[in-house]
């Protein structure tokens, strides 16, 4: 009988696929790069943040103060779309419980690729309301990513915005000094700090790359994020398949 690949997460009280929690750190770096890329590119092309909520709430408040209702609606729509992506990723994950061998993260990344390519095409084609559609597509893609990839090596990560990463970084460091009796699995704060710093650096590098690409290539510059997602998707699928073969042989 094939071993089930699903476990109950003790930290969040939710069912998540084990291949997500055991994913290698390079995937987290790649997704953080994509998160920074999409957020910066979205701001350059659509003047809104597509990867997190806080910045858009501030921009929305400024737009309200300036009585710019069109801009207000734009920022709010991006916020709602990003938040919808999180529970949507959970709904997409449910069918994978029946097919443990299927790869959840590659599926999410495939959907991201479709959304990003569609967003780039819409903006490049100068269709009506192209900027708004672009922002909604990219924010939905990053919302899905944020909901699908949330934990690695036992710590929470956020690959689409730095606020969560900095919070995790500070709290991890604080726990190092505040906790007298720490369980053995959590006694490696140094490696966790390095991991969070590296993910944050990947996000910043992605933001700089994304901004440079869209400033030079305009809407087509977004395809760089889609290309990286395709590479990550193929790599994750191959690793998942090899892991399943080893499990069956064992």
Feature-to-residue mapping (PLM):
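Alpha-helical transmembrane segments of multi-pass membrane proteins
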Residues: 2-250
């Amino acid at each position: 009988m094939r071993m089930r690949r699903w476990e109950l997460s003790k930290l969040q009280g939710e069912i998540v696929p084990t291949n997500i929690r055991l994913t290698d750190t390079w995937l987290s770096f790649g997704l953080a790069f994509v998160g920074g890329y999409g957020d910066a590119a979205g701001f350059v092309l659509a003047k809104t943040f597509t990867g997190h909520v806080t910045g858009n709430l501030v921009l929305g408040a400024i737009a309200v103060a300036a009585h710019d209702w069109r801009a207000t609606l734009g920022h709010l729509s991006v916020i709602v779309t990003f938040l919808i992506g999180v529970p949507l990723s959970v709904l997409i994950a449910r069918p994978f419980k029946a097919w443990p061998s299927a790869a959840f993260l590659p599926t999410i990344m495939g959907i991201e690729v479709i959304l990003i390519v569609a967003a780039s095409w819409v903006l490049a084609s100068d269709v009506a309301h192209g900027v708004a559609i672009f922002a909604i597509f990219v924010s939905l893609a990053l919302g899905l990513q944020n909901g699908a990839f949330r934990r690695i090596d036992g710590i929470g990560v956020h690959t689409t915005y730095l606020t969560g990463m900095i919070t995790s970084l500070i709290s991890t460091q604080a726990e190092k000094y505040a906790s007298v009796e720490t369980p053995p699995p959590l006694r490696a704060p140094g490696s966790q700090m390095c991991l969070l710093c590296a993910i944050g650096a990947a996000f910043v590098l992605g933001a700089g790359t994304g901004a440079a690409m869209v400033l030079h290539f305009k809407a087509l510059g977004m395809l760089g994020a889609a290309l990286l997602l395709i590479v990550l998707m193929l790599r994750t699928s191959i690793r998942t398949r090899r892991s399943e073969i080893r499990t069956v042989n064992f």
